[in-house]
């Protein structure tokens, strides 16, 4: 029995993909019934659509791997690369007017928008090669551990394709169903994607205006505070206050009373003390409310710090180039 089961699993994993059978996946049939009753989708059309969907064992394999936790000094090297910095400068130069417009409308500075796109997809170069329909169907119907979440995202995907008049067979994205240059999940697309150029479509796959406007809108709706700081380095003696909370838990007035030396920021600002693994010794940082807002995009302190440092590096590099051109 065990040998037969093991052989069957080997055969299953060895397949690159196979069709989604409604007989094999009754949860898919229940999903179709729910979409029909709740959102008035045509059941026959959905059955036809899912007959073309493919279950991808490679996606299950990737999702099932244990997450590898890297220390900050290794994580940083992935994103703070010369290529990512140079291409970020070029992206900023190429779309300067759109970035300025997004800052006027949403209050989000260009460097944050540029850094998000740099970290997520290398400015649109690596947006994923899976059909979103296949990725979300695989995870909704063949990955029980997170089936509920991905079924909701599949629901949102079908709704957005109907709203945007897209063929659900066409959009491509990551193995988890994240889409476009900013890697929005379908629920995020429906809430935050912006038609920034007013052409009647929200295109985060090919339209730089919509990409930039959508990222800016995401941050604005998540509570970005215009012209407020993101993070600043602290001396090691503040280490005892460090914690892993994402939400800011101190006012600056409280931190000053606790002996944390701070630049002249308003006492009412909120922040948190963060400890990261440096290569030789811990790095202690103060993450303000805007640092927390970055974690709304990806709930990781390391991710938020990578975005912040990439943003500051790109901005500094661009300013150096502009200064050199004037002299």
Residue spans of the language-model regions?
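An acidic, Gly/Ser/Thr/Pro-rich helix-cap/linker signature
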Residues: 20-94, 100-103
């Amino acid at each position: 029995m065990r040998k037969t089961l093991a052989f069957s699993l080997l055969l299953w994993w060895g397949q690159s993909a196979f069709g989604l059978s409604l007989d094999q996946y009754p949860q898919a049939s229940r999903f179709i019934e729910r979409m029909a009753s709740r959102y008035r989708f045509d059941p026959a059309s959905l059955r036809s659509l899912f007959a073309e969907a493919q279950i991808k064992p490679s996606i299950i394999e990737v999702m099932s791997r244990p997450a590898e936790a890297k220390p900050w000094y290794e994580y940083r090297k992935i994103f703070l690369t010369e290529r990512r910095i140079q291409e970020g400068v070029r992206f900023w130069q190429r779309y300067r007017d759109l970035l300025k417009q997004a800052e006027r409308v949403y209050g989000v500075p260009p460097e944050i928008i540029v850094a998000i796109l740099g970290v997520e997809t290398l400015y649109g170069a690596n947006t994923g090669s899976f059909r979103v329909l296949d990725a979300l169907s695989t995870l909704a119907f063949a990955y029980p551990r997170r089936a509920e979440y991905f079924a909701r995202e599949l629901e949102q995907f079908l709704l957005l394709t109907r709203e945007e008049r897209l063929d659900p067979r066409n959009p491509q994205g990551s193995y988890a169903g994240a889409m476009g240059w900013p890697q929005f999940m379908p629920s995020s697309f429906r809430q935050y994607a912006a038609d920034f150029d007013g052409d009647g479509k929200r295109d985060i796959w090919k339209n730089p205006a919509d990409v930039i406007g959508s990222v800016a809108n995401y941050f604005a709706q998540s509570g970005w505070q215009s012209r407020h700081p993101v993070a600043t380095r602290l001396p090691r003696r503040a280490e005892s206050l460090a914690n892993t909370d994402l939400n800011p838990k101190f006012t600056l007035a409280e931190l000053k009373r606790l002996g944390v030396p701070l630049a002249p920021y308003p006492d009412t600002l909120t922040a948190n003390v963060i400890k990261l693994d440096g290569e030789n010794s811990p790095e202690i940082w103060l993450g303000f409310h805007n640092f927390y807002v970055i974690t709304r995009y990806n709930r990781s302190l390391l991710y938020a710090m990578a975005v912040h440092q990439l943003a500051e590096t790109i901005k500094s590099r661009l300013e150096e180039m502009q200064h050199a051109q004037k002299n």
